[in-house]
Amino acid sequence: MPTKARIRLWSTNVENLNYVITQIRGIVEKTGIEMRGPIPLPTSKLEVPIMRLPHGEGRKKWEKWEMRVHKRLIDIAADERVMRQLMRVRVPEDVYIEIQLI
């Protein structure tokens, strides 16, 4: 039977990501289970250069659009009660969660 659960979270909005992490931390502290993290993983930047003029004539002026994806990693002991409560956590639309049992 797995003894650990590795939770990976990622989002483009840091405030929503931290909100979900505080909810997970509250559940873990209530049950008294060992928790490691949140470990901040490297932020990936997606850059898209777009030419400002649609017809292509004149000076070439570029706009650069950027999207940052923030990632966190949490390791907790895999307890059945805690896993059920984690499934009930309300998660905003722009936060993605992946749970892996180790």
Curated annotation (Swiss-Prot):
Pfam families: Ribosomal_S10. PROSITE patterns: RIBOSOMAL_S10 (PS00361). One of its GO terms (cellular component) is cytosolic small ribosomal subunit. InterPro entries: Ribosomal_uS10, Ribosomal_uS10_CS, Ribosomal_uS10_dom, Ribosomal_uS10_dom_sf, Ribosomal_uS10_euk/arc. One of its GO terms (biological process) is translation. GO terms for molecular function: structural constituent of ribosome; tRNA binding. SMART domains: Ribosomal_S10 (SM01403). Keywords: Ribonucleoprotein, Ribosomal protein. It comes from the Archaea. Part of the 30S ribosomal subunit. Belongs to the universal ribosomal protein uS10 family. PANTHER family: 30S RIBOSOMAL PROTEIN S10 FAMILY MEMBER (PTHR11700). NCBIfam families: uS10_euk_arch. Involved in the binding of tRNA to the ribosomes. This is Small ribosomal subunit protein uS10. It comes from Saccharolobus solfataricus (strain ATCC 35092 / DSM 1617 / JCM 11322 / P2) (Sulfolobus solfataricus). The gene is rps10.
